[in-house]
Structures are given as structure tokens and as C-alpha cells.
Design a protein with these regions (language model features):
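Structural and coupling elements of P-loop NTPases
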Residues: 1-349
Length: 349
């Protein structure tokens, strides 16, 4: 909570070439917190996404809420990401919710990069926070300093990686330092969840953001696309409703390609139904643009896909999703009087 996720997201979008300037939460002009409630309260309520580049490589980020009240948005976003940047404040340190998010990421086999934020504040303790990440989360942290470069991670860091990987150690002893081999093996260790890079910085003034961009480019670049003839398959990670009542289904494409007007298999009670994609778009904050097609790894939004729910798999091997791991402590029930017709109640809801 209040670790600086949205501020860091704005800096990534700014330094990644998407924004002309980074917005501020306290000014209410951020790209990703565009909802009226978010801007008035100064907190992230809805998970929203945008594109940026790191060292010439394309990325898409999803800025998620930090408050436990909106953990559902965060958990659903985990289904869509190839890696996660876990932001920890150097002032508050590792919190209980940090541990919850960490467990969810581990359960879903999502690689993690730590950004230790607010290191510029007088009460910050970067070293203590790094030690707490190692002790409380059990993460094998690889500290990446301000001189880290995606093109050449450096021999000192390569030696740290070699100490964790027999293949890289053998190659290092035989041939010496090889920048490409060190970067590739480092990326493999990060993808496997065996190593978690960590960057210390201060998102508000941009400190450490360029280092983070280089870390993402070196260790977290998108996987290679599958063969073009693979059957289309995607996971639903979010559903939004337009003002006209239409449903927009947000998808992470897992294989194959999706184009507008194509029929897609969707899970329904008792079997599978086919729905036509009436529109395909890519979102960036509150704005969107039409897509001609969406390939493997793409985050897109489709209209017309029936009543699918977050977690469902559509396309080949269409099936309902697993229930969320996080359960709310409180629940609410709407009790209508006998004078209210069921259809009218449904319209009101």
C-alpha cells in the first residue's frame, strides 16, 4: 500500500517513450489512474494497462491496486503477466500484503523483479529493506546497481549468476566472461523464479527507473512467439462494462492469432458456445485503438464474447477458470421485496 506503484508506472511510460511527461498521483493527472474515483481518492482502484519500450524492446505493463480491498484486481492481473515488478517501500519495508502478493506470484510461477522505492527519503533504509526481502520472503535477490546495462551486465554480476548456475559456471571457467551467455542464463534463472533482480530507487524523481528498464530488457523480454499455425487460445483476465451496457473482455493471447469477426469457442454451463468477435482493441490507460490482429503474448480487449468470466480460457481447449485464491472477509447480499419483479432487479444491478 502506497509503495509507489502508479508513480513508478508513470515513470516507466515516460522514460519508455509513451508519455511526454510523467503524471503525479497527488496532481490527479496520471495516465493509468483515470477513473473519477481514483483521481479524487488518490489511490488505484482498477487495474489498467499501457505499452512502453525498454532498450528498444516492446513491453506492456498493468498497474494494479495496492490496497487489500481491491486485491481481486491484482490477482486477476497476475493471470496476464509474464513477469511482475514488486514495489517495496524503503520506508515501510515488507508489509503483510507484500507477502500475500509474493505468495500469489509464486503460486502462479510468475518471475519477480523487486523495485525498492522511496530510497531518497530521510527515513529510508534500503539495506534493511533488501535484507527483509531476503529474510521474510525467502527470495534469492540479485542486486542490480545503477551501472547495470542490458547489453552487457558486467563480469561482477555474471560471477554472482555463475555461483547460482552450474552451466554458466562451467562456461565461465572454460571461456571466461561472455556477455551474451551471462545475460541469457540470467534470463533463464529469472524466468524459472530462481533469482529475483532488485533495483533501489526513487520513482518520484526517476532514480533507478533507467536501471529497471535495463533489467527488464535483459531478463524479462517477451518469450518467442509460437508457430503461426497454432490454434488460438487466450485467458480472460478482466471484464469491463461500457456505458451502453456492452461487455469488454480483456484477453492474454497464449497461442495462435485472433482477428475481428472470427468465431471463438467460449466455455458455458454444460459445454462450449461460439461467439463472434465484434471488435478488437488495445488499451492504454483510458484510451484505446483498434487492432487488426492479436498474436501470442498480446494483451487485447474483445467485444462480443458472451458471458465469459475472468480466469476462463477461450479458443482451443476452452474451459472455465479456477476460483480466485483470495477470498473477501466480508460479503453482501441484495434482498428485494416481493413487489419488485426479478427482471427489474436484474436491470438495477
Amino acid at each position: 500500500v502506497d509503495a509507489g506503484k502508479t508513480t513508478l508506472s508513470e515513470q516507466l511510460l515516460y522514460r519508455g517513450g509513451t508519455l511526454r511527461r510523467a503524471g503525479r498521483v497527488d496532481s490527479g493527472d496520471t495516465c493509468l489512474d483515470h477513473d473519477v474515483i481514483e483521481r479524487s481518492r488518490g489511490i488505484t482502484v482498477f487495474a489498467d494497462e499501457a505499452a512502453f519500450t525498454a532498450c528498444g524492446l516492446p513491453f506492456r505493463l498493468i498497474d494494479t491496486p495496492g490496497h487489500a480491498d481491491f486485491s481481486g484486481e491484482m490477482e486477476r492481473s497476475i493471470w496476464a503477466v509474464d513477469c511482475a515488478v514488486l514495489v517495496v517501500s524503503c520506508v515501510e519495508g515488507v508489509q503483510a500484503h507484500t507477502e500475500t502478493v509474493w505468495r500469489l506470484l509464486r503460486q502462479n510461477d510468475v518471475p519477480v523483479v523487486f523495485f525498492l522505492n522511496k530510497a531518497d527519503l530521510p527515513t529510508a533504509d534500503a539495506a534493511g529493506t533488501l535484507a527483509a526481502v531476503r529474510a521474510r520472503l525467502g527470495a534469492d535477490v540479485l542486486a542490480c546497481g545503477p551501472d547495470f546495462c542490458a547489453a552487457d551486465i558486467g563480469e561482477a554480476l555474471a560471477e554472482e549468476l555463475a555461483a547460482r548456475d552450474e552451466t554458466l559456471m562451467e562456461d565461465y571457467l572454460v571461456r571466461g566472461y561472455d556477455a551474451q551467455a551471462a545475460r541469457e542464463r540470467g534470463a533463464a534463472l529469472v524466468r524459472a523464479g530462481l533469482v529475483c533482480p532488485a533495483v533501489v530507487g526513487a520513482a518520484l524523481n526517476g532514480t533507478g527507473v533507467d536501471t529497471l528498464l535495463n533489467v527488464l530488457a535483459a531478463f524479462c523480454a517477451a518469450p518467442q512467439e509460437e508457430a503461426g499455425d497454432a490454434l488460438f487460445r487466450a485467458r480472460v483476465y478482466k471484464v469491463r462494462h461500457e456505458k451502453n451496457g456492452g461487455r469488454i473482455v480483456f484477453l492474454k493471447v497464449l497461442a495462435g492469432r485472433l482477428r475481428p469477426k472470427e468465431n471463438v469457442a467460449c466455455p458455458e454451463k454444460g459445454g462450449t458456445a461460439y461467439y463472434k468477435v465484434n471488435g478488437l482493441r488495445a488499451y492504454s490507460g483510458g484510451k484505446s485503438a483498434p487492432l487488426a490482429e492479436a498474436g501470442p503474448g498480446t494483451l487485447c480487449a474483445a467485444a462480443g464474447l458472451g458471458r465469459v468470466m475472468p480466469g476462463d480460457v477461450v479458443g482451443a481447449d476452452a474451459r472455465p477458470g479456477m476460483p480466485p485464491a483470495l477470498r473477501p472477509l466480508l460479503s453482501a447480499q441484495v434482498l428485494a421485496g416481493p413487489a419488485l419483479p426479478p427482471r427489474r432487479l436484474l436491470e438495477l444491478l
